[in-house]
Amino acid sequence: MTTILDLLGKDADYLLNHQCIIKKEALTLPSGDFVSRVFAESDRNNRVLRSLQQMFDHGRLGGSGYLSILPVDQGVEHTAGASFAKNPMYFDPENIVRLAIESGCSAVASSYGVLSILARRYAHKIPFLLKLNHNELLSYPTTYHQIFFSQVEDAYNMGAVAVGATVYFGSESSNEEIVSVAKAFSRARELGLATVLWCYLRNPHFTRNGVDYHTAADLTGQADHLGATLGADIVKQKLPTLQEGFKTINFSKTDDLVYSELSSNHPIDLCRYQVLNSYCGKVGLINSGGPSSGQNDFTEAAKTAVINKRAGGMGLILGRKAFQRPFSEGVQLLNLIQDIYLDPTISIS
């Protein structure tokens, strides 16, 4: 049987024994009583606290303070053909929800169409997270603009416990998206729903000399900070891969201490800088799993989970690596990352 150490390979010591520049004592870390410790002191009403607790109590990670969410909104974001051609069973929304249930996920996140058509059968069996806005890829030339496909009331009526939305920070449409998401999240809180923000960057100028800074820790960290400012209970972010986006692109403001005293080039330090920007962990950071690369998916997923956990993150929201493979293997992959969060020997750095 392949172990986590086998999957980490030569990177095992590098990832499992690293000590972060920012000490964990400076952070609010995930735990079974996270909702009571953090959000009970906030302005969230009792119904929001209950909704959050439902996600934290559900699935294999229930009671741990960590989340394993299956997101399948790629049929809109990346087109259904590109997303499901490798595994056509997922054109049927029921198999999406079945995968989340059978793999013991904390919640399933998807579009209004997917969740609404199954709500009466499954909303009481697994927490629903309704993704409110999307970027559709049927416009030509391709544009990037998150528009609302559904409303907060739709989530409430179908029995969802949470809503999600994306803001493309740095894009031409970001100001409009910020305003619309702020209104939606305010309404969600009134109705007792938890809120998750996809804090993504989108700007052609964020690529310089062939290097893509959309995953720079300083830029993504600021996006997380803006997401927390919008009142998100949880922020979703891509795993950072490099640093010094602000300095290289030469825009906005930063400080040399960000790079010398608050982070390093180690992936766990880069991710910890994201956690730092998420109100020192008071707003949970979940990282995305990224695209499927085929045979390396298990190794990549294991490394991502180890980095997120050891950095002080709250879990993974992983989709394509799980559903773009046979059903049983998808369950196995999701269980793998859950095992990492449940493993007491993989400690927070």
From Swiss-Prot:
Catalytic function, reaction form: beta-D-fructose 1,6-bisphosphate = D-glyceraldehyde 3-phosphate + dihydroxyacetone phosphate
The EC number(s) this enzyme carries: 4.1.2.13
Biological processes, Gene Ontology terms: glycolytic process
Molecular functions per Gene Ontology: fructose-bisphosphate aldolase activity
Active site positions: 236 (schiff-base intermediate with dihydroxyacetone-p)
InterPro entries on file: Aldolase_TIM (IPR013785), DeoC/FbaB/LacD_aldolase (IPR002915), DeoC/FbaB_aldolase (IPR050456), FbaB-like (IPR041720)
SUPFAM superfamilies on file: Aldolase
Keyword annotations: Cytoplasm, Glycolysis, Lyase, Schiff base
Record-given protein name: Probable fructose-bisphosphate aldolase class 1
Organism: Chlamydia muridarum (strain MoPn / Nigg)
